[in-house]
Amino acid sequence: MPDDQQPNDQHMVDMLGIVLTGDDSGAPVDNSIIAARLGWNLETVASCLNEAKERSLVWGQRSGDKPAPWFKELEITVQGRRLLRSHSANA
């Protein structure tokens, strides 16, 4: 995702896919793992996670790491799973 772009549903789906993989495998992810897997910078991940959290798509333990918000042990919520299902149904 370009640095100057606001997260959209496709960005959320991309990010949620990474969170879901970690959630399902029992190896929760954090900001740095998402950044590495998607090729995004940490500021972009933080921005996307902030919106995902506001939309109740993810849950995670917030830490003091920067750039904020930084989450450890991210999990996908029911709402996040619904977004993934609706996006895959529309694809």
Feature names for model-found ranges:
Residues M1-D4, L38, S86-A91:
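Short intrinsically disordered terminal tails
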Residues M1-L16:
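Short alpha-helical segments that sit at the start of domains
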Residues Q6, G39-E54, F71:
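Short amphipathic alpha-helical interaction segments
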Residues M15-G22, L83:
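Short amphipathic alpha-helical elements of helix-turn-helix/winged-helix folds
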Residues S25-R37:
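Short acidic, hydrophobic short linear motifs in intrinsically disordered regions
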Residues K53-G64:
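A short, conserved structural fragment
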Residues D65-E75:
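Minor-groove-contacting beta-hairpin "wing" of winged helix-turn-helix DNA-binding domains
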Residues L74-A91:
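Short, amphipathic alpha-helical interaction segments positioned at domain boundaries
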